């Protein structure tokens, strides 16, 4: 029986989705979060659509064991190619994806109708953000740029490193020349680099953090359905992984700005 006490399930192909956990904890600290990172099969972006949809089904089944009141897809690839699979496997559980949440917020925020999107090679090549944005507002122009080095830079903790800034300037220069007024961070790793990116774009360009966008959407939907946990205690997330990377502890600390890493459970999918 789903109630306000039921957990919120979040899954990603790896550890990038921890930025969604961070955003959820900031906005909804009383919610019990079950996070599953499919670290044994990362990355998803290089897999076929058939395989990605299979993984989406299996990841959802992993979370359904905990009877969640909501499932958040913190993976842009699954958001683009497997949303319907998660919805059907979830059997009526509300499903949110970072892609749609980020696209909707970008459409609301742009003033000049020129939106930039940065993401991994797979996400940009899929054209998923551009399709989602133009489906919402056909008159908007979308300019996309793959930034493949941002993920390793984030995972190495090179957040304010001079080399990172040089790479970011090279990536963003093309988009800035397109007179965009809104920039979507189309990868869940990228919020780690948000401050540096904002320094390069300047204050006049609105940065859309898809992790924050999906957390805000979750808060609204939970409240609308009387499923918001109103407890005053802050809950520690329950972490599940399909393989335990050597750097998981340091990455968790980096992504959540946390001094303590909770126990991590190894699960089979």
Swiss-Prot record:
Annotated EC: 5.1.1.3
Sites where the protein binds substrate: 12-13, 44-45, 76-77, 188-189
Keywords: Cell shape, Cell wall biogenesis/degradation, Isomerase, Peptidoglycan synthesis
Biological processes, Gene Ontology terms: cell wall organization; peptidoglycan biosynthetic process; regulation of cell shape
SUPFAM superfamilies linked: Aspartate/glutamate racemase (SSF53681)
MF (Gene Ontology): glutamate racemase activity
Pfam families named among the record's database cross-references: Asp_Glu_race
Catalyzed reaction equations: L-glutamate = D-glutamate
Pathway(s) served: Cell wall biogenesis; peptidoglycan biosynthesis
Signal peptide segment: none
Gene3D superfamilies noted in UniProt: 3.40.50.1860
Residues at the active site: 75, 187
InterPro entries on file: Asp/Glu/hydantoin_racemase, Asp/Glu_race, Asp/Glu_racemase_AS_2, Glu_race
Record-stated family: Belongs to the aspartate/glutamate racemases family.
Function: Provides the (R)-glutamate required for cell wall biosynthesis.
HAMAP family, per the entry: Glu_racemase
Protein name listed in UniProt: Glutamate racemase
Lineage of source species: Bacteria, Pseudomonadati, Chlorobiota, Chlorobiia, Chlorobiales
């Amino acid at each position: 029986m789903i109630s306000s006490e039921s957990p919120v399930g979040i899954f990603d192909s790896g550890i990038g989705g921890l930025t969604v956990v961070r955003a959820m904890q900031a906005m909804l600290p009383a919610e019990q979060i079950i996070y599953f990172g499919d670290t044994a099969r990362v990355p998803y972006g290089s897999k076929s659509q058939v395989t990605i949809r299979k993984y989406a089904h299996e990841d959802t089944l992993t979370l359904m064991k905990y009877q969640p009141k909501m499932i958040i897809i913190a993976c842009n690839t699954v958001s683009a190619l497997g949303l319907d699979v998660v919805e059907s496997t979830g059997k009526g559980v509300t499903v949110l994806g970072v892609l749609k949440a980020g696209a909707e917020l970008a459409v609301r925020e742009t003033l000049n109708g020129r939106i930039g999107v940065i993401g991994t090679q797979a996400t940009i090549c899929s054209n998923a953000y551009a399709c989602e944005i133009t489906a919402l507002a056909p008159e908007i122009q979308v300019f996309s740029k793959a930034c493949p080095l941002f993920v390793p830079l984030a995972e190495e903790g090179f957040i304010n490193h001079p080399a990172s800034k040089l790479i970011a300037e090279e990536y963003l220069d093309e988009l800035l020349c397109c007179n965009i007024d809104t920039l979507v961070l189309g990868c869940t790793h990228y919020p780690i680099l948000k401050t540096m990116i904002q320094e390069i774009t300047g204050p006049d360009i609105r940065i859309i953090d898809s992790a924050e966008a999906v957390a805000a959407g979750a808060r609204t939907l939970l409240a609308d359905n009387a499923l918001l946990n109103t407890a005053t205690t802050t809950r520690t997330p329950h972490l599940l992984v399909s393989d335990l990377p050597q750097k998981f502890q340091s990455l968790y600390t980096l992504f959540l700005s946390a001094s303590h890493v909770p126990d991590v459970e190894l699960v089979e999918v």
